[in-house]
Amino acid sequence: MAAGRPVRGPELAPRRLLQLLLLVLLGGRGRGAALSGNVTGPGPRSAGGSARRNAPVTSPPPPLLSHCGRAAHCEPLRYNVCLGSALPYGATTTLLAGDSDSQEEAHSKLVLWSGLRNAPRCWAVIQPLLCAVYMPKCENDRVELPSRTLCQATRGPCAIVERERGWPDFLRCTPDHFPEGCPNEVQNIKFNSSGQCEAPLVRTDNPKSWYEDVEGCGIQCQNPLFTEAEHQDMHSYIAAFGAVTGLCTLFTLATFVADWRNSNRYPAVILFYVNACFFVGSIGWLAQFMDGARREIVCRADGTMRFGEPTSSETLSCVIIFVIVYYALMAGVVWFVVLTYAWHTSFKALGTTYQPLSGKTSYFHLLTWSLPFVLTVAILAVAQVDGDSVSGICFVGYKNYRYRAGFVLAPIGLVLIVGGYFLIRGVMTLFSIKSNHPGLLSEKAASKINETMLRLGIFGFLAFGFVLITFSCHFYDFFNQAEWERSFRDYVLCQANVTIGLPTKKPIPDCEIKNRPSLLVEKINLFAMFGTGIAMSTWVWTKATLLIWRRTWCRLTGHSDDEPKRIKKSKMIAKAFSKRRELLQNPGQELSFSMHTVSHDGPVAGLAFELNEPSADVSSAWAQHVTKMVARRGAILPQDVSVTPVATPVPPEEQANLWLVEAEISPELEKRLGRKKKRRKRKKEVCPLGPAPELHHSAPVPATSAVPRLPQLPRQKCLVAANAWGTGEPCRQGAWTVVSNPFCPEPSPHQDPFLPGASAPRVWAQGRLQGLGSIHSRTNLMEAELLDADSDF
C-alpha cells in the first residue's frame, strides 16, 4: 500500500482475513507466523498470543468515516506534549499545518500561538484546535481531520485574531479542512483552561469589563498610558490646587455670611452662589484623598477601570463624585451668565430709582439649578460616566469623547458667548456713564466706576482665557485619542505575544507605548478649572472685606468697634419718623442707631454706585437737629393720624388759645402775584400788643364731600407765619392757620411779643426767628414714608 494513497477503513479487515485463509490452506507455518507477527506485533507467536489473552478488553475506537480522514505520511511523535497536555497517541503528521514542514517547526508555531494564553476565554477553546491541526493523530498512514464544530467554537472568543492578523487559510473553518460531524481524539484531551491576562490587562469574568475583543481580560484600574510617577505627580498637583480653590471659595462664602444683611443684594449676592458651586466642586475633587477612596471611586470590584457607569453591580461612589463635580461645574457657569446679565441691567439703571432685578431673582434660581440637573440626568441615562485614575474622579466622556464634547464643551461655549456679550455691554454702559455724564458723578462714584471697569476687564480676560485653555486641551485630547488607543492596543498585543501569521524565529522585542498623552496638557486643563474658581473668589479681596471681618471679630469678642460709622441721611430721617411717638412725648430725646442702621459696603465693593448722593458723610449738627427738622416739616404730629382715614373722624373739642397769629395776603400783592406769578414772598409783621382777638371763622363752610378729611388739630403755642400787612396796621380777622409743633421754642415774657411786659416786638420771617441758622431745605422723605414706621433700622 503506497503512502499517500487513500485507504478506506472498511476494506482493510476483509483483505487481511483473505491473506490468513490462503496461508492456512497452503500449510505454511513459518510464513503464517511471520505474517502474524507483522500484524500483531513483534515477538514469538505464543508470547504474542499470551499477551493478547492477558490484556484488558477495551472497546475499539469508532470507525473513521471516509470524509473525516486523509491519507498522510505518519511520523513518530518527537514531542509527546501539546500546549502542556499529554497526547494519547504516538504518531502524527504535519500535513494539516500549512505553515510547518516539520514537527520542530510546528512546535515553534505552537509556542507563538501560546500568546493567546493571555486571552483566557480564547485560550480555553483554541487549544484543542491547535493540537488537532499542528499535532494530529496519524495512524496507518491516515490522519484525523478536526470537526467543523471545534473550529467554529473559536471564532467568538478569539475575535482578536481575526481583527488583528486574520486567521491563516488552514485555520479557516472551510469544509475541506473541517468537515461536519467528525469525532477527534484531541477532543478527549483535558487542557489547562486557566489562562492569564498579561499587564496592563487583568482577569475578569464581567463581560462589561472586557477589553474589546480580549474576552476574559479588562484594562487595569490604573491608567496604563501614564506611569506610576506621573500618577503621583498629578495627585499632588490636584491636592494643592484643589485645596487652594476650596479655601478661597470658603473664605468668600464666610465673608458673605458674616455680613449677610448688607451682602444679600443683587447682583453682588450672585457671586456667593458662584463661589458656593466651585467650593462644592473642589470638595468632589478632594474626596479622593480619603483613605482608600480613590480606588473605590475609579475602580471596579474586579480591579478594572470603571466606564459606562452607572451599573447595577457596582457601588455609587463613582456616580456620587460625578454628580458633585459636574453639577457644581455646570451650575457655576450658568450662574456666571446670570451674573453678567445682572451687571448689564444694573449698570443701565444707574442714577434712577428703577430696580431692574426686582421680581427676577426666582427665575434666576430656577434656571441655574434646573438646567444642570437636566444635563446630569441625561448623562446618567445614557451611562457615559467613566473613571480616571490620573484625575481620581469620575466624569463624562473619558472613554467616548463625543459625549464630553456635547455635555461639557457645548455648554461652556454657549456660556462664553452669552456671558461675554453681557459683560462687554456692561463695561460699555459704565464707560458711557463716565464719559457722557461727568457732572452727575461725584468723585467717589467716578472712582468706583473706574475701579469696577478695571476689575471687570481683568475678570473678563481671565474668564475668556480659562475657557479658551479648556477648549484647547479638550481638542488636543479629541484629535489624538485615536492614536493613543492604537498605541495602547499594540502594546497589549505585544505583551500578549499575539504574533499570528508571522513565520519568524526572531525574539520578541520589548513592548512600550509609543504615543501617550502629555501630562503637562492635563495639568494646564486642571489649572484652568481651578483658576476659574479662584478668580471668582477675588471679588471679595477688598478693603471692605477687612472691615467686615473686623466688625465680626468685635461682635464675637464683645469689644467696641472704634471705626467711624457712616449713616445715610435718608435712613436718619426715616428713623426719626418711626420714633415719632417717643419724640412727641420727649422732644429732647436723641436718636440711637444700631449697627444695622450703619451704612457700609458689602464684601463686593465697587458695585454700589451712589450717583445721587455726593457724600455720605453727615455732620454732627445735622444729626442733632434731624428731629426738629422732621417736626418742622410736619412729619411729627401731636397724635397718630392716618394718612388715608377710612371715615371722617370726629374733630376734637376746640379750646381757646391765646397764642395765635393772623395771616392774610394784601389785595395789592395778590394782584401782582396773579399778573406775574414770579414773586412769591410775603411780608410779615408781628401783631401789636394787646388782648388776643376772638376767633371768627368768616370763611364759608365747605360743602359735604365724600373725601375723608383730617381732624381738626388742637391749637398749641407755635409761630408758623406772620401777617403780610404793613407796620402799625391793625390785624385782620379770618383765615387762621393752626399747626401743632411741639419743637418750637417756648418764648420767655421778656422775649415774646404777645405777652404783656415785652420790651420790644420780635421780628419773624417765614416761620422762624431771624438770625437763626437755616434748616436744610431739600430732604427726601420718600424713603421714610415707604419704610415701616416701627422697624429697627
Curated annotation (Swiss-Prot):
Region spans: Required for interaction with PRKACA: 574-657
Function: G protein-coupled receptor which associates with the patched protein (PTCH) to transduce hedgehog protein signaling. Binding of sonic hedgehog (SHH) to its receptor patched prevents inhibition of smoothened (SMO) by patched. When active, SMO binds to and sequesters protein kinase A catalytic subunit PRKACA at the cell membrane, preventing PRKACA-mediated phosphorylation of GLI transcription factors which releases the GLI proteins from PRKACA-mediated inhibition and allows for transcriptional activation of hedgehog pathway target genes.
Biased composition range(s): Basic residues: 674-684
GO molecular function: cAMP-dependent protein kinase inhibitor activity; G protein-coupled receptor activity; oxysterol binding; patched binding; protein kinase A catalytic subunit binding; protein sequestering activity
Record topology, Extracellular segments: 31-237, 288-318, 384-406, 477-528
Chain segments annotated as coiled-coil in the UniProt record: none
Domain FZ span(s) in chain numbering: 69-185
Protein name: Protein smoothened
Residue positions binding cholesterol: D99, Y398
Organism expressing this protein natively: Rattus norvegicus
Compartments (UniProt record): Cell membrane; Cell projection, Cilium
A GO-annotated cellular component: neuronal cell body
Cytoplasmic side: 259-266, 340-362, 428-455, 550-793
Gene name in the database record: Smo
SMART domains referenced in this protein's UniProt entry, alphabetically: FRI (SM00063), Frizzled (SM01330)
